[in-house]
Amino acid sequence: MSDAQALGIKNSNEANGALNGSYASVSVGSQTLKVPVIIQPGQAKGTVGLSFGYGERLGLEDEMQTGVNAYALYANFKNVQNVEVKLDSGEHEFACVQLHNTLMGRGDIVKETTLEVFNTKDKAHWNLMPQVSKNHIEFDVTSPEVDMWQEFDRSIGHHFNLSIDLNSCTGCGACVVACHAENNVPVVGKSEVRKSRDMHWLRIDRYYSSATTFEGDNQTKEDISGIGDSLNTFGEMEKAASNPQVAFQPVMCQHCNHAPCETVCPVAATSHGRQGQNHMAYNRCVGTRYCANNCPYKVRRFNWFNYPSYRKFTEVNPAQDDLGRMVLNPDVVVRTRGVMEKCSFCVQKIQTGKLVAKKAYRPLVDGDVTTACSDVCPSNAITFGDWNDVESDIRKSSEEKRSYQALEEIGVKPNIWYKVKVRNEVNEELVEIQTAHGHGESHGDEHGDAGHDAGDNHGDGGNHDLDTGHGNGEGDHQPSGH
């Protein structure tokens, strides 16, 4: 039994998926704080985690005063305290939209291996080619001989790509904040987030393993036989392990070369540019939301309201304040109600970089253009640049043997790369499973070349949203796992 169960602390979901949680009283000596509880797997038994940085009162309006000051319990600045936790009255409404926490064996989305396997085995063992089923037989995905898309020579001019190293990503969220600031992404407030109306152009999917390791999940899925076994096993795989592995995966618009959003827009509001970007023409968009329905990555966002001016959002959207409007980026249009929006690869920064190079009478060189997310990433997990520049960091990154593109089997050919996560740990289970893998040694050292010159780009698959934190910070603490 977990600590949360023993204390009677629960998290529950409303019909629309919105997350609610119990309150608890946390006491150290004579100091007691009433805080909401969000239950997370992997929390060590007998411990709680309490967030600092909330509870500020001075200089803030009432609606901005959120949470409690946890420093009251931080006696003598000791990380370990003798804490008493009790169930308290009330129910807290969390702004958390990441409700499905496990991959359930979909290892082609977040790929990982151990350092031992990485150093001793061919990439066919740990960076497997995705497969599709034909007549109940699995086949490696290859570029189709017949393609109904009208292709053009992508080697002419610039072709911008982005690479994300899952080894380096810590899930800190700096990229999400930078994206909001750079692209005037509206702040919608806690109640809208609970309705899954968040506007993040970039989210960070957080996954827990349902077995000891993610590769263990994949093996469990492979061992499933029959409908009955499938229902029972997948039901169990929805639950995270008590001591799971954790992986973070930033997900934004993949700027697919064969973008499914472009083919369904009835007014051609979204289209593909020669530089590899999927563009949005806001003044053409009529808000059908067909593009969002047809996006396999769920990265498009719809403006349900006119967030920058509607009085309902005055308390949560700083852009409605005279001072707050001064931080809006004048190079990016502020969208209005009924318009779809998404990641643009910071097209305004690309155009600025090209203009600077033009005024200097020189060609664009690697490093001239960056995105907001790649600029601020503290671990340098995000690389951006011109893929057609053979000496660029992005070209070299995409051609590394760790590079892959998730969901490449659906054939949308995106311009986002991910790198296999390598864990520096002793994991006999993972070594045994991946040593047995290797359904073909041909995942291709020239994966990057095929990705563009032959039109063999691929795709990503995190279908969750970021734990947004709009109003989610009232001293949230985490008792032990489920």
Label for each model-derived stretch:
Residues 3-161, 167, 178-181, 442, ...:
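Long, contiguous, secondary-structure-rich segments that constitute the structural scaffold
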Residues 320-323, 338-452, 460-467, 473-482:
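Long, compositionally biased charged/polar accessory segments in the mid-to-C-terminal portions
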